[in-house]
């Protein structure tokens, strides 16, 4: 399992003498991070949130794709395999795109469950589009603008949001918030889509309440839905 210290040691140590990264240095950091997590997973939520400092949405998608190539769930907090493992080279891009857009269970080729699919979506839409080399000082272990980095690249995990909103009356407001972030299931959201998402949230919130009473393991251990 990868920790914040692993990320620092693997990707950041060589670049501690200057605040401004070159494009090449930023690419090296990105490749090291993807290499570290393509066949492993983040040890805890804190580590995944720390990664948000260095990732763009496109870089995150590259990480998901690399994890899938290694038969791992795309969500970096998970150590399981996707529910449905497919050979990524068995179809062309057109066929792949068609399946993703028309198969309601296409996410199971990339994630172990719908829950981690939602978690991954929620994480990705919060990532900054700003190039890593433009994020001055974000890679430094000690920087006078650390507090600013914490604010600028702050990421809230879906699991955290559910824990904070763990009551039935908050479901609709949570759905509204997800839509504002562009987290609707498809670009043309329908009433059926809204109902499906609401049902998902109701189910997960109910399981959270059980977790709080029985003190089991983390949310990431949710099994897939039938």
Swiss-Prot record:
Main location: cytoplasm
Disulphide connectivity of cysteines: none
Positions of Zn(2+) binding: 73, 78, 112, 116
Record-linked PANTHER family: RNA POLYMERASE II SUBUNIT B1 CTD PHOSPHATASE RPAP2-RELATED (PTHR14732:SF0)
Subunit structure, interactors included: Interacts with RPO21.
Family: Belongs to the RPAP2 family.
Protein name per its UniProtKB record: RNA polymerase II subunit B1 CTD phosphatase RTR1
Organism: Saccharomyces cerevisiae (strain ATCC 204508 / S288c) (Baker's yeast)
Gene: RTR1
């Amino acid at each position: 399992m990868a920790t914040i210290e692993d990320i620092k040691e693997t990707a950041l140590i060589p670049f501690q003498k200057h605040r401004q990264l070159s494009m090449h240095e930023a690419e090296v950091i990105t490749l090291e991070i993807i290499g570290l997590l393509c066949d492993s997973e983040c040890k805890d939520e804190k580590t995944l949130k720390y990664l948000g400092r260095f990732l763009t949405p496109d870089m995150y998608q590259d990480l998901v794709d690399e994890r899938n190539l290694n038969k791992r769930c795309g969500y970096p907090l998970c150590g399981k395999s996707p529910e449905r493992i497919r050979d990524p080279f068995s179809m062309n891009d057109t066929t792949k795109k068609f399946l993703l857009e028309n198969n309601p269970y296409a996410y199971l080729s990339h994630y172990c469950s719908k829950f981690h699919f939602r978690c991954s979506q929620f994480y990705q839409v919060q990532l900054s589009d700003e190039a890593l080399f433009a994020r001055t000082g974000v890679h430094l272990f000690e920087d006078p603008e650390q507090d600013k980095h914490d604010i600028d690249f702050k990421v809230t995990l879906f699991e955290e949001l559910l824990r904070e909103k763990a009551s039935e009356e908050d479901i609709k407001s949570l759905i509204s918030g997800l839509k504002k972030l562009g987290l609707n299931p498809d670009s043309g959201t329908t009433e059926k889509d809204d109902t499906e998402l609401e049902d998902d949230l109701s189910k997960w919130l109910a399981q959270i309440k059980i977790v709080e009473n029985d003190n089991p393991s983390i949310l990431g251990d949710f099994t897939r839905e039938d």
